[in-house]
UniProtKB/Swiss-Prot annotation:
Pathway: Cofactor biosynthesis; thiamine diphosphate biosynthesis. This is Phosphomethylpyrimidine synthase. Its EC number is 4.1.99.17. Pfam families: ThiC-associated (PF13667), ThiC_Rad_SAM (PF01964). Zn(2+) binds at residues 419, 483. Residues 1-13 have a biased composition (Polar residues). Residues 1-22 are annotated as: Disordered. Catalyzes the synthesis of the hydroxymethylpyrimidine phosphate (HMP-P) moiety of thiamine from aminoimidazole ribotide (AIR) in a radical S-adenosyl-L-methionine (SAM)-dependent reaction. It catalyses: 5-amino-1-(5-phospho-beta-D-ribosyl)imidazole + S-adenosyl-L-methionine = 4-amino-2-methyl-5-(phosphooxymethyl)pyrimidine + CO + 5'-deoxyadenosine + formate + L-methionine + 3 H(+).
């Protein structure tokens, strides 16, 4: 690999080890017992008197104490054997790494190169390569078996309450089954309603599925900029994001060392990695959109395909004829990729090369099974611009491109807005399903108001929960730094947790069979004052415990039947437990009735006597009533 690097640069340091009171477990599917599908088991206290709780896990080997993490070597490349077993691929030398791939960075500022090099694979003509092609042929791949086991959380049969949960939810036409089988996964992919983003060169990947009939997924964006960040920080942010629940990660780097940063991330990522190739292509022509060419973009696509990127955001729906539709907008074109292509189209007065070369783009991506994430380059960047003609014209074009990509054998999902007030969100979901043949929808929020810079993880979390309920398959997180700056690792965690809440709330509302298990387990822990279980069952045990410890830090407080909100005398749950305990001491049901009835009658008689004593008037002097009440206390 002819990459210049600075030998003084340090290797990335990442967070490892299990989450509190958790352990990594692995499920083995009946149809492929050699597979090890990761889950996280939350270990409950003995006082719980119930089994430990398995939950979906995105953290990869980083939370498995039995695995030695070597970021310099990367994660185990388990999927290569699956790909070779299917056949239809070839190993080849691949393109040389060029100085412009890393922004022509000088040796003094070059990041340390990832040393381990593996020759890339590509599909052979006339052979099935993509998960879509295998699914249409009726073939269930190991990736399909893997994700079915993962969605079921290792269960071998449906939950007893699965049918009731489905009936209780409102799925808006989604067809969530009581139990996920590999055949169901295959059929959803064959219909284009779900994708497994899994480049054949991302051998470190733990496969996952995106589709509205599966668990709602979330994406975390990372990436450097020309102003700040480094390879070390971005690898750390990737590992940090998946620790807290990011299902996929997008590397949106726009600064130096783009190729090297991406290589480090991919070789150490167990989750799908997405990119926006136009960003790197723009860096290769010194940031001037007018100088972009199809040849340069094509070379960038192949470069990233060979590295193992799992999905590309491609803004092929930004057409010359739509650009004028944005002229009356409050915030114009806010997508970076959309604005780049709009400027190119206007400068050359030509149709976008992403649109005119779309067939060829499909052919390239198919050879590596890279999924499309058809970008919404004309998404609204303000509430005022939501659902306008520019936005929906592009969406209609994305529907046309989806069908072309499907015909070519490529997997597709569709990107969505943006900034949309609550009452305009559902029409976005409905129109996307109609125009794009139910291809998975992947939205940025949407943000439901524009008035809260610094809190846009909340403004967008509201919209994300809603559109997830309506059928959006994956939600792209927004951090508190949105519109303000590049997020650091704390912002990444806040964004991920916010969007895990939104995704889970959507799954509950849809009636997903397993969604409520964790809620119920936490509610039981809360009612029984099992504080440690309550912390550990939450999405962020560390923060929950730290908030509790701010006022009740002693270990004895972890078994106390109250918290600092209400104290021991006013805790509603403690009072309810006292009532239950009292009722339990009265074994004879008739005695309970007599006792309660007698208590009520005595109280009524006492108040009647008091009323007469004070003169029998409807309206009494307030001070006299207060004085009289003292005698009753």
């Amino acid at each position: 690999m002819n990459i210049r690097s600075n030998p003084d640069t340090t290797l990335p340091a990442v967070t490892t080890g299990p989450l509190p009171s958790s352990r990594k477990i692995y499920a083995a599917p009946d149809s492929a017992p050699d597979l090890r599908v990761p889950l996280r088991e939350i270990i409950l206290s003995e006082a719980a008197g119930e089994p430990n709780l398995p939950v979906y896990d995105t953290s990869g080997p980083y939370t498995d104490p039995s695995v030695t993490i070597d970021v310099n070597a990367g994660l185990p490349r388990n999927r290569t054997a699956w790909v070779l077993e299917r056949g239809g691929v070839e190993e080849y030398e691949g393109r040389d790494i060029k100085p412009e791939d890393n922004g022509n960075v000088g040796a003094d500022k070059a990041a340390k190169a990832f040393i381990a090099h593996h020759k890339p694979l590509r599909g052979l003509d006339g052979h099935k390569i993509t998960q879509l092609e295998f699914a249409r042929a009726g073939i269930i791949t190991k990736e399909m078996i893997y994700v079915a086991e993962r969605e079921n959380l290792g269960r071998k049969q449906q939950l007893e309450r699965a049918e009731a949960a489905l009936a209780d939810g409102e799925s808006f036409g989604a067809e969530v089954p009581a139990f996920i089988t590999p055949e169901f996964v295959r059929s959803e992919i064959a219909r284009g309603r779900a994708i497994i983003p899994c480049n054949i060169n991302h051998a470190e990947l733990e496969p996952m599925i995106i589709g509205r009939n599966f668990l709602t997924k979330i994406n975390a964006n990372i990436g450097n900029s020309a102003v700040t960040s480094s390879v070390e920080e971005e690898v750390d942010k990737m590992v940090w994001a998946i620790r807290w629940g990011a299902d996929t990660v997008m590397d949106l780097s726009t600064g130096r060392n783009i190729h090297t940063t991406r290589e480090w991330i991919l070789r150490n990522s167990p989750v799908p990695i997405g990119t926006v190739p136009i960003y790197q292509a723009l860096e290769k022509c010194n940031g001037d959109p007018v100088k972009l060419t199809w040849e340069l973009y094509k070379d960038t696509l192949i470069e990233q395909c060979e590295q193992g990127v799992d999905y590309f955001t491609i803004h092929a729906g930004v057409r010359l004829q739509y650009i004028h539709l944005t002229a009356s907008r409050v915030t114009g074109i806010v997508s970076r990729g959309g604005s780049i292509m709009a400027k190119w189209c206007l400068a050359h007065h030509k149709e976008s090369f992403l649109y005119t070369h779309f067939d060829e783009i499909c052919d390239i991506m198919r050879k590596y099974d890279v999924s499309f994430s058809l970008g919404d380059g004309l998404r609204p960047g303000s509430i005022a611009d939501a659902n306008d003609r520019a936005q929906f014209a592009e969406l209609e074009t994305l529907g046309e491109l989806t069908k072309i990509a499907w015909d070519k054998g490529c997997q597709v999902m569709i990107e969505g807005p943006g900034h949309v007030p609550m009452h305009k969100i559902k029409i976005n979901m409905d129109k996307q399903l109609k125009e794009c043949g139910e291809a998975p929808f992947y939205t940025l929020g949407p943000l439901t108001t524009d008035i809260a810079p610094g809190y846009d993880h909340i403004t967008s979390g509201i919209g994300a929960a809603m559109i997830g309920w309506f059928g959006c398959a994956m939600l792209c997180y927004v951090t508190p730094k949105e519109h303000l700056g590049l997020p650091d690792r704390n912002d990444v965690k806040t964004g991920v947790i916010t969007y895990k809440i939104a995704a889970h709330a959507a799954d509950l509302a849809k009636g997903h069979p397993a969604a409520q298990l964790r809620d119920d387990a936490l509610s039981r822990a809360r009612f029984e004052f099992r504080w440690t279980d309550q912390f550990n069952l939450g999405l962020d045990p560390d923060t929950a415990k730290s908030f509790h410890d701010e006022t009740l830090p002693k270990e004895a407080h972890k078994v106390a039947h109250f918290c600092s909100m209400c104290g021991p005398k006013f805790c509603s749950m403690k009072i309810t437990q006292d009532v239950r305990d009292y009722a339990a001491t009265l074994n004879d049901p008739t005695t309970v009735g007599v006792t309660i009835s007698g208590t009520i009658e005595d109280g009524m008689a006492q108040m009647s006597a008091k009323f007469k004593e004070m003169g029998g008037s409807v309206y009494l002097d307030a001070d006299k009533v207060k004085e009289s009440n003292k005698a009753l206390s």
